[in-house]
Amino acid sequence: MRALLLPALLAAALSAALPADAENFPEGDINPYIEAADAFVLPLYCKAKMAITDTFSSGQDRFSEGFFIRKDNKVVFVNTAPASQKNFALLRNEDLFYQRFANTNKVVKTSATASARGGETSNLDLTRFNTTLDYTVAYLGREKAAGKDCYKFELKARNRKLAYGLVHAWIEVATRLPVKRSFFAVAGKELKYYLVRAVTMKGSRVVQMDIEYVDALRPEETSRLKMFEITPLKNVPEQFFTKEYLESGRLYPYDF
């Protein structure tokens, strides 16, 4: 009898030791799921154009446009308009961030937390295309968001230098498309959130996504970010992801 009980007790102990997210998430391992969902929107090697409209409580809107190029965990974002913001650029190489000031060759180190271009988009918002690089992920269950059936996840920052130590993310069950994210302060107060307002598909891939960032404390202040002409690439030159590239001033390699 004792011999029969030992395996059962061992199995029960092992089951209790498993984290709830690993045990309950219906689609298996969480990290591969999250990484696949990220890459479904923006492939590991890709380029796209981006337009951002900032709305302020003062009633003055601001518009800028540019492009970004992604190579796995490396991203470069370059403004092409308006003239006052031309050549403003952000470079992310893993955990290293650089900023190029508009209309100059000055390049400085910056951080994920800064909001170099202003508005509701931080440097990390413009260069974070791999969630698991910055956050550990736990499954919280299924929940409706924006009227859609979603998986809800809790993201905890791996690095204290990130602006938001805690994030909640909702991904639509049927499509694996992002629906909403809420960003919290250390004390648990919601600071901002984003909602995906529109997605355009071409066959089985995303070619355009419209995201609205909202200041949770001042909801009249928003940043509307549109990524369009999302194009998968077979190869991306390494030269784009260096400080020297930003300093060169030759920042319009979009057609390669």
Regions found by a protein language model. Name each.
Residues P7-S15:
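Bacterial N-terminal signal peptides
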Residues A16-N24:
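Boundary at the C-terminal end of the N-terminal hydrophobic targeting segment
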Residues E23-L42, K49, E94-G165, F240-F256:
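Flexible, processing/modification-adjacent segments and terminal tails
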Residues F25-N103:
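N-terminal mature ectodomain segment of secretory-pathway/periplasmic proteins
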Residues A48, V75-N79, F97-F101, V107-K109, ...:
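Short hydrophobic/aromatic-rich beta-strand segments that constitute the beta-sheet cores
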Residues A83-Q85, N105-V107, A116, A185-A187:
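Short, surface-exposed beta-strand-loop junctions and turns on beta-sheet-rich folds
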Residues K148-F241:
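Gly/Pro-enriched, hydrophobic low-complexity segments
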